[in-house]
Regions:
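Mid-to-C-terminal secondary-structure elements
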Residues: 127-142, 152-253
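Hydrophobic, regular-secondary-structure patches
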Residues: 42-120, 127-130, 145-146, 163-164, ...
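Short helix-coil transition/hinge motifs at the ends and kinks of transmembrane helices
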Residues: 68-76, 194-199, 251-257, 358-373
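Peri-transmembrane interface segments
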Residues: 226, 242, 253-287
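Alpha-helical membrane-interface segments at transmembrane helix boundaries
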Residues: 10, 14, 41-45, 49, ...
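Transmembrane alpha-helical interface segments in multi-pass membrane proteins
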Residues: 5-10, 14, 18-26, 33, ...
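Short juxtamembrane loops and helix-capping segments at transmembrane helix boundaries
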Residues: 53-55, 351-380
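Short cytosolic juxtamembrane segments of multi-pass membrane proteins
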Residues: 3-4, 398-413
Length: 413
């Protein structure tokens, strides 16, 4: 049966070479549009997510603020600030916390044998590395537990600062002065995409153990507290518990949103996911309508084929061919046209995406758009659309063919 259907399709193809070829090209172009647009959309979405996580990887950053309500005889406008003991209190009291880090911060002067510069320095704990995606290049490391416990004078540098202070590229293991205190460089951060930042990008950051920072600068209060839940679903619960604990300790109303400020990267990721979905839907819609126009061409060809083969259809029905045989023949031909055009389009689109990926573009627009990504979702969606269009383009002409009256069709010229 399938062999006969293919033979009949090839005969029709020879009769309608130009029209069929143009339709296949249209299907091919529509397929390229759908896959390429979705690939670039997926690349953009991943790049935006990477840039967001460059500032905070599924964390919440809590900052002290000012009370906006009077409470138990205390006036509004009081300053609320975090201390290191609060970090330990959160760690003991909130089991949904996966990791937590204190964070001090101030501007400092750094001096090496080659250069002097000013930058923002933070005093943090060990989990800060993963929470802020500050991973070291080969040969170096981030701060460890012994650095914190022993208040070591070690520093982890952002790549821009490291290049400025050590232009020969040998920062790791060398010494520098921070506010006239000697430190050893234990690591340099890998380059990363960062779209959310405070006090400048992490590439210009210097990081030391929070214990060393406190001992050196005698800071009583933290700049912020970073918390990552064991699961994003605990985000609101942890925020509520932090507010409750701080409200009891520092005597303010737990619903006073101004007393504690939160920079919520988990919520930002949810918003980004919704934006990414919107981009996907929009780009898919553009490609879908391109394919839909091509599908009209397929339907047009099938109507022409039905008209030209009216006498043949009548003969088949006269000798016993059933309607389902007639319908399946034209649906198969429509699907086959879509399959040929779609297959060529998939190969070309894959080649375009692979070619762009191989260029490894960096800087400027490339840093924002990212590299296109061929995803399984895009392939499944495209296949589904092609099948739907093929069926729609074949069903209506096929039904018309099935309704042909054998007697009348035999007189058709």
């Amino acid at each position: 049966m399938w062999i006969n259907l293919i033979k009949e399709f090839m005969q029709d193809l020879r009769k309608q070479k130009l029209r069929t070829s143009l339709t296949i090209i249209a299907i091919c172009w529509g397929t390229i549009a759908v896959i390429a647009l979705l690939a670039f959309g997926e690349g953009l979405n991943r790049q935006l997510l990477s840039g967001l996580r460059g500032g905070g990887n599924q964390i919440m950053m809590f900052y002290g603020g000012q009370t906006s309500q009077s409470f138990e005889g205390l006036d509004a406008g009081r300053r609320i600030r975090f201390a290191e003991e609060d970090v330990e209190l959160f760690r003991r009291s909130i089991p949904q916390i996966e990791s937590i880090s204190a964070q001090y911060g101030r501007s400092v002067s750094l001096k090496s044998d080659y250069a002097t510069t000013n930058t923002y320095m933070e005093g943090v704990d060990v989990p800060f590395e993963d929470m802020r995606t500050m991973y070291p290049v080969a040969g170096g490391r981030f701060l460890n537990a012994r650095d914190v416990a022993e208040q070591r004078r070690v520093v982890f540098l952002g790549p821009a600062v490291a290049e400025q202070l050590f232009p020969d590229g040998n920062a790791i293991g060398n010494r520098l002065m921070i506010d006239n205190n000697p430190y050893t460089v234990v690591g340099v951060m890998q380059e990363k995409m960062q779209m959310a930042m405070s006090h400048g990008p992490d590439s210009r950051r210097a990081v030391i153990p929070h214990s060393t920072f406190r001992q050196t600068y005698n800071h009583a209060f933290l700049g912020s507290v970073l918390i990552r839940p064991v699961h994003p679903e605990y985000q609101k619960r942890i925020e509520h518990q932090v507010r409750e604990i701080m409200a009891r300790k520092y005597r303010f109303h737990h619903d006073d949103m101004q007393a504690i400020q939160v920079w919520d990267f988990i919520e930002a990721e949810r918003i980004q996911a919704q934006i990414g979905l919107g981009i996907k839907i929009f780009l898919f819609s553009v490609g879908f309508f391109t394919l839909l126009i091509a599908g009209v061409g397929v339907a047009n060809i099938m109507y022409v084929v039905v008209k030209e083969r009216t006498r043949e259809i009548g003969v088949k029905k006269a000798i016993g061919a059933k309607n389902r045989h007639i319908i399946s023949q034209f649906i198969f031909e429509a699907l086959f046209i879509c399959m040929i055009g779609g297959s060529i389009g998939v190969l070309i689109a894959a080649g375009i995406v692979t070619g762009v990926q191989s260029l490894e573009l960096q800087g400027g627009v490339a840093d924002f758009l990212g590299n296109p990504v061929l995803s399984a979702d895009a392939m499944i969606m495209t296949t589904g659309v092609l099948t739907m269009i093929g069926l729609a383009a074949g069903v209506f002409p096929a039904r018309r063919a099935a309704l042909v009256n054998p007697v009348e069709s035999l007189r058709y010229e």
